[in-house]
């Protein structure tokens, strides 16, 4: 049986995260798979930044990235020590497929396929088109996860879902009762 150390981080800009010490964290924690959200950079930036950790770790990274078509927005990535066998960025409808919010990556682990998903669900604003868009995204996400489950897939969903179900999910829960992401 293979044990994997998996991490997920909303970096809110990967260059800023590296300025704040992310490279040291990666070297200290030594994850096998890292899912990133709100990358806000190009694939070349990810390759360059994570290359700085490779000597200390003794391995190179496999980098898959779904950048948003709007530069400086969203973007999700999966970095791994092991080579992926496949990846997909299509969630559907088409409006989501260019938003840099969904990335599925398959790995062969002990002869079985493990699908790792990195996703970023925007917060949405109450009673606005953004909230409608968020619910459409969540519906598409649910349909995709149902399809994966029907196939018997082993799946790990990682990301910033911007959803709080209980008081424990958010620090200031009373102040957020009427905010998107923490609605009844």
Spans of features found by a protein language model:
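Short amphipathic alpha-helices and their capping/turn segments at secondary-structure boundaries
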Residues: 23-27, 102-111, 140-153
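Metal-dependent phosphoesterases centered on the DNase I-like endonuclease/exonuclease/phosphatase
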Residues: 53-56, 137-184
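Soluble or luminal CAZymes and related metallo-dependent hydrolases
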Residues: 14-18, 97, 133-140, 182-184
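Proline-centered loop/turn at the N-terminus of a beta-strand
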Residues: 5, 62, 115, 154-156
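Surface-exposed cleft-lining segments at the edges of enzyme active sites
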Residues: 92-95, 121-138, 172-179
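Structured beta-strand-rich core segments of catalytic domains in phosphoester-bond hydrolases
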Residues: 40-124
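N-terminal, active-site-proximal structural segment of metallo-dependent hydrolase catalytic domains
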Residues: 1-55, 63-76
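Short catalytic/ligand-binding loop motif for oxyanion handling, primarily in non-cytosolic enzymes
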Residues: 15, 43-45, 72-73, 124-127, ...
């Amino acid at each position: 049986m293979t044990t994997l150390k998996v991490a997920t981080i909303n970096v809110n800009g990967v260059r800023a995260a590296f300025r704040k010490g992310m490279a040291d964290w990666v070297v200290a924690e030594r994850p096998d798979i890292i899912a990133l959200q709100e990358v806000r950079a190009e694939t070349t930036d990810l390759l360059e930044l994570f290359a700085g950790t490779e000597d200390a770790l003794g391995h190179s990274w496999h980098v898959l990235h779904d950048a948003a078509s709007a530069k400086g927005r969203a973007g999700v990535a999966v970095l791994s020590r092991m080579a992926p066998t496949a990846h997909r960025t299509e969630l559907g409808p088409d409006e989501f497929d260019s938003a840099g919010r969904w990335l599925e990556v398959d790995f062969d682990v002990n002869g079985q396929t493990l699908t790792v998903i990195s996703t970023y669900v925007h917060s949405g604003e109450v009673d606005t088109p953004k909230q409608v868009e968020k619910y459409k995204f969540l519906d598409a996400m649910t349909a995709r996860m149902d399809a994966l489950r029907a196939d018997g897939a082993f799946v790990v969903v990682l990301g910033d879902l911007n959803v709080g179900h209980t008081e424990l999910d958010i620090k200031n829960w009373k102040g957020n009762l009427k905010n998107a992401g923490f609605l009844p």
